[in-house]
Swiss-Prot record:
Top-level taxon of the source organism: Bacteria
Functional summary from the UniProt entry: Involved in the binding of tRNA to the ribosomes.
Similarity section: Belongs to the universal ribosomal protein uS10 family.
Gene name of this polypeptide: rpsJ
UniProt-listed InterPro entries: Ribosomal_uS10 (IPR001848), Ribosomal_uS10_CS (IPR018268), Ribosomal_uS10_dom (IPR027486), Ribosomal_uS10_dom_sf (IPR036838)
Any GO BP annotation: translation
Keyword Transcription: no
A molecular function GO annotation: tRNA binding
Protein keywords: Ribonucleoprotein, Ribosomal protein
PANTHER family listed in its UniProt record: 30S RIBOSOMAL PROTEIN S10 FAMILY MEMBER
Provenance organism: Streptococcus pyogenes serotype M12 (strain MGAS2096)
GO cellular component: ribonucleoprotein complex; ribosome
Protein known as: Small ribosomal subunit protein uS10
Assembly with partners or alone: Part of the 30S ribosomal subunit.
Length: 102
């Protein structure tokens, strides 16, 4: 797999679990002999939901809920077969969405 690049994009609602997953990926890739660029923090998506507190009236009384999606990007440059096997066996925390592009 010479001159190839694996791009890993991570998404999670909690930034601490996202950072631990990124650290595990970087540590695994460097241990197996590949170069790593990242983790690069990408912009956080912020979804805001406004809901009326009362069921029938009192429209002036509202409550707002926010949901943030944190993202990180990790590039693995010139991965070996050993790197790919180690990444496939890697156990990441739940709640982290992983997208891999070759």
């Amino acid at each position: 797999m010479a001159n190839k690049k694996i791009r890993i994009r991570l998404k999670a609602y909690e930034h601490r679990t996202l950072d631990t997953a990124a650290e595990k990926i970087v540590e695994t890739a460097t241990r197996t002999g590949a170069k790593v660029a990242g983790p690069v923090p990408l912009p956080t998506e912020r979804s805001l939901y406004t809901i009326i507190r009362a069921t029938h009236k009192y429209k002036d009384s509202r409550e707002q809920f926010e949901m943030r999606t944190h993202k990180r990007l990790v590039d693995i440059i010139n991965p070996t077969q050993k790197t790919v096997d180690a990444l496939m066996k890697l156990d990441l925390p739940s709640g982290v969405n992983v997208e891999i592009k070759l």
